[in-house]
Regions:
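Canonical positions in the second alpha-helix
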Residues: 9, 42-43, 77
Length: 105
């Protein structure tokens, strides 16, 4: 779904983890990264253990050249993913974090 459809659902009073995550994803796909931040953050308010939201929020911060926030987000996301047993997400975020730290040097 595109972001406008998802925003319409939000305006109609629907608000939950999957709607916010989906809206964040749609905005990323539309290259509207700064708008996506709030929706991934809201998704994490619904479920702080949602590894995919941490991962995409980190990617958004990278796209926005907000590297310290991206590093912090990936570090938190890795901790959450490992604690919850989401080893694939943890592995991916570790790779992204390693690349980001190399790039920042």
């Amino acid at each position: 779904m595109n972001s406008e459809t998802l925003k319409s659902m939000l305006q109609q009073g629907q608000d939950n983890l999957l709607l916010r995550y989906g809206l964040g994803q749609a905005l990323v796909n539309e290259k509207r990264h700064s708008e996506a931040v709030e929706h991934f953050q809201k998704a994490l308010e619904f479920d702080p253990d949602h590894s995919s939201s941490w991962k995409l929020l980190g990617k958004v911060f990278v796209e926005l050249n907000e590297y310290p926030r991206a590093i912090e987000t990936y570090e938190q996301g890795i901790h959450v993913a490992e604690r919850c047993g989401d080893l694939q997400a943890a592995k991916e975020m570790k790779v992204f974090l390693k690349r980001l730290k190399k790039q920042a040097v």
